[in-house]
Amino acid sequence: MVKFRFAPSPTGHLHAGNARLAVVNALAARAMGGTLLLRIDDTDRERSKPEYEAGIEQDLRWLGIGWDEMARQSDRMDRYAAAAERLKAAGLLYPCFESEEELAAKRALRAKRHLPPVYDRAMLSLTAEQRAAAEAGGKRPYFRFKLSDGAVAWNDLVLGRREVALGTVSDPVLIRADGTPLYTFTSVVDDLELGVTHVVRGEDHVTNTAVQIDLMRALEPRRAVPAFGHLPLISDVTGEKLSKRAGSVSVRQFRRDGIEAMALVSYLARLGSRRDPEPLTLEELAGTFDLGDFSRGAPRFDPKQLLALNRRVLHGLPFEAVAERLPEGCGAEFWMAVRGNLDLLSEARLWWEVVSGEIETPSLPEAASLLRAALEALPPEPWDETTWKGWTGAVAAASGARGKALYLPLRLALTGESHGPELAALLPLIGRARAAARLERAAG
């Protein structure tokens, strides 16, 4: 069974970079007929918060992303402890006693000698007596995994063949001095025990993947490791790293700003791929989804492109899809009249005020004669979408005005705006009494 996973840490709000990974993993799982595991990586006791976890789940549901299985790392501490004991028994997890200052001094010395900052494995040579003496002196050990010799290679689902020489990498710390397991370790144990077959994450994990593959082989030598894929990290429009601490790129903020879930999902699903973004459902996106479509260059997250896609989404939404989010009293006729002019759904409220409330009618003394002619030619109700053409034809005949000289003063008087939805559709919604009052006020 194919199983992908999305593994956020509940240390903040879900941001665009992580949301993209959620979308990509969900789509890949659907495309391959597999399942999606939501794993909450909450071993950082100080920074992990229940409210962030709840917020992540809420954001995923808003995006339309469901999961088939859920796991929480804080519930699996016994599994990490058991795996650590197996590694210790095999001589692959060894205690270390250096302080941060001592490690920094070692790195500085290696840099001075023009050597890579790789851990020197000094603690491997400690005798049992030396270790006991260190602990008796109040030092608490942290534990490193002894990497294999040679290199680790894999066929990356996005980047192609990748190879990392393990001699260029420090033996990773798996267990802190306080006994807390670190991500490199917990992630491997979870992927093995929970049956994850595909891991798709950011390109910043490439070296970490080599380490984790080596660790997987140490824990389960007879088991196939998952397939790995690494997406290039998102940058902003200037090419700089997209900061996940910038509130403006959190899913929560996009939602508050009025971005539609379909627009955000469609944008993130195609960001960095050879396919142009278009407004599609998750099912439609999954139908053509292929990890091989993603390029190896860093994609740029452009809010203007997202807004343009949001506009396209709104223009195609039926009334039933938005009815509950529109101002009270709005009907299908209103929605069909204004949807083609919206960037954000919240803008519908402004046009509802235009057709049903009071507006600040501009004074247009230079167009007074035209507006009085329009008032006199205003036909009796009932009105429909043909009323506008007949009425403006009569006004043109009476005033001699044509084109912009005819239509702009009427639009300003009736809506208070110089641009907007087609007046043929708005006029029946405004109604005769309101239209007459506005024309009279504008004429002065």
Curated annotation (Swiss-Prot):
Show where the record puts the motif 'HIGH' region.
Answer: 8-18
- One biological process GO term for this chain? glutamyl-tRNA aminoacylation
Q: Which SUPFAM superfamilies match?
A: An anticodon-binding domain of class I aminoacyl-tRNA synthetases, Nucleotidylyl transferase
Statement: the UniProt record of this protein carries the keyword Cell wall biogenesis/degradation:
no
Q: Where found? A: Cytoplasm
Q: Which UniProt keywords apply?
A: Aminoacyl-tRNA synthetase, ATP-binding, Cytoplasm, Ligase, Nucleotide-binding, Protein biosynthesis
* Cellular component GO terms, alphabetical: cytosol
Described purpose of this protein according to its UniProt entry = Catalyzes the attachment of glutamate to tRNA(Glu) in a two-step reaction: glutamate is first activated by ATP to form Glu-AMP and then transferred to the acceptor end of tRNA(Glu).
Q: Which family does it belong to?
A: Belongs to the class-I aminoacyl-tRNA synthetase family. Glutamate--tRNA ligase type 1 subfamily.
HAMAP family in the record: Glu_tRNA_synth_type1
Annotated protein name in UniProt: Glutamate--tRNA ligase 2
Q: What is the lineage of its organism?
A: Bacteria, Pseudomonadati, Pseudomonadota, Alphaproteobacteria, Acetobacterales
Task: Point out the gene that encodes the protein.
Answer: gltX2
